[in-house]
Amino acid sequence: GLITSRLTDVPGSSRYVDQSVVVYSNEAKTQLLDVPAELVREHGAVSEPVGLAMAEGIKAKAHAGVGVGVTGIAGPTGGSPEKPVGTVVVAAVTDSERRVRTFRFFGERELVKFQASQAALDMVRRMLQV
């Protein structure tokens, strides 16, 4: 949501933004983006395989040139020793490239979300070299 909000703050963004999907629950990830439930069970919702599957899912559903998937723990609760609050996976895919990275952001929930959106936008910018 925040990524799309930031993209559509730019006049003329309808030329490059067609749609976005916010999938908060594991069920939404599987139902709307075709993320395999077994992938979520095996790796957890906040994992690089799930982030990539989300990016691939939205790209396929939207018939888009680029798909972006972000999954994470913004806090203040929900973290674990293995995946503390601030753990965010960002993935982006095109027809020719797949990128995924796990970040650890610090700060309040809103700051974690902003940093995640910044990381996603930067990843896409670097992929497209713009």
Q: What are these language model-derived features?
A:
Residues 1-130:
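Short alpha-helical segments enriched in small residues
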